[in-house]
Amino acid sequence: MIPVRGFEDKTVAVFGLGRTGLTAARALIAGGAKVALWDEKPASREAAAAEGFAVVDLQAADWSQFAALMLSPGVPLSHPKPHWTVEKARAAGVEVLGDVELFARTVNAAPAHKRPKIIAITGTNGKSTTTALIGHLCASAGRDTRVGGNIGLGVLGLEDMHGGAVYVLELSSYQLDLTSSLKPDAVVLLNISPDHLDRHGGMDGYIAAKRRIFLNQGKGDTAIIGVDDAWCQQICTEITAANRRTIWPISAGKAMGRGVYALQGVLYDATGERVVEVADILRARSLPGRHNWQNAAAAYAAARAIGISMQDAVDGLMTFPGLAHRMETVGKIGKVRFVNDSKATNADAARQAMSSYPKFYWIAGGVAKAGGIDDLKDLFPRIAKAYLIGEAAEPFSWTLAGKAECVLSGTLEKAVQQAYADAAASGEEAIVLLSPACASFDQFSDFEARGEAFRAAVNGLTAGGGKAAVA
């Protein structure tokens, strides 16, 4: 745990008692603060009280006693409308912040020789894979590495800092909205496509949240920016004009005079005086697909930005074990392979997996994002058949009508059974792909639970009396 500095003998209100809120409360107390916790769920309040926390009804509280409101990132800050705790805090002149901001202030308050290196990663898609990959590169190069934020442990739950440590942090747009003091040594912005627009009031608000990650960078820091979409290209152009830091563009499809890029799966380093061919990403078994070329370029650049050697960075790419729920093979029965890409919670993320296979039996659906699957129409000819689940099943069937055969499966378990039956009947080598292009909250607690349900459904299938074998 990282004890939070700057709130000694002050009281901080904490709203939202999930993993982030409880971890922040513990870290605040460890740093000498007092806390007043609240959640709208009685079970969460009871669990906090059982742990010994002061549970205070923030609706009835005197807000003048609070030095700050620590808001969990899932709670609306501004859109569709500010949460009532935010309105009360603002009315009382109480600042609203998140756990990443508490971490940033604690780092900034530490003596220079005790401050760790910080690599911060954001983007619409690929954040978790890239964060885990950077963590692996740093750790395999011998650095004392801690990985967290929007992946794994909340940032304040990581081991306490020292000058030789490297913190690799995945940051969502929600977290960035609540952060103003973070100064990363290296920032990675992978890509931007429409997502979470209801929480940011539209595309401009979403982009503004992502841009906050660069807010405090200056001389000696590095900005690593994907330039394969127009929004990130514009950000790269604007930040380059500011000329305050080192900027390395990254691309998964075009050669550049400066930066790191991949062409046909080969990684090139153009950060020095000449372009160097450094790795064949196609040899990295846990980085399949063109989208992972960008992830590899970003991770390599981030590792190099904090002084890891070219060879150590390349070695790390080749030994990366991969992440669950990201194009993860969970089993094979006969000629049918089952791929879990449950992390694909929007159409752009699903595109990455769908583009990797010439033909597949597609399981999709859940809570659709803006635009649904309209942007995937160019990939519909690859769909052998679609099996639709959750709230989006019927709308998705309308989009697919006349373009790809589909069935309303309803549940994930039924979809797996139907997809396996059809794939096995084809007699060919086949892929059953769970890449939902949707959030999971209509039927599951999160994408991980959805992915585990897919794994369980696959394991529940039999072929000649045997369970699915992990390929």
Swiss-Prot record:
It is found in: Cytoplasm. Keywords: ATP-binding, Cell cycle, Cell division, Cell shape, Cell wall biogenesis/degradation, Cytoplasm, Ligase, Nucleotide-binding, Peptidoglycan synthesis. ATP binds at G123, T124, N125, G126, K127, S128, T129. It holds the Pfam family MurD-like_N. One of its GO terms (biological process) is cell wall organization. Gene3D superfamilies: Mur ligase, C-terminal domain, Mur-like, catalytic domain, NAD(P)-binding Rossmann-like Domain. Its main location: cytoplasm. One of its GO terms (molecular function) is UDP-N-acetylmuramoylalanine-D-glutamate ligase activity. Its EC number is 6.3.2.9. InterPro entries: Mur-like_cat_sf (IPR036565), Mur_ligase_C (IPR004101), Mur_ligase_C_dom_sf (IPR036615), Mur_ligase_cen (IPR013221), MurD (IPR005762). Pathway: Cell wall biogenesis; peptidoglycan biosynthesis. It catalyses: UDP-N-acetyl-alpha-D-muramoyl-L-alanine + D-glutamate + ATP = UDP-N-acetyl-alpha-D-muramoyl-L-alanyl-D-glutamate + ADP + phosphate + H(+). One of its GO terms (cellular component) is cytoplasm. Transmembrane segments: none annotated. Belongs to the MurCDEF family. Cell wall formation. Catalyzes the addition of glutamate to the nucleotide precursor UDP-N-acetylmuramoyl-L-alanine (UMA). This is UDP-N-acetylmuramoylalanine--D-glutamate ligase. It comes from Caulobacter vibrioides (strain NA1000 / CB15N) (Caulobacter crescentus).
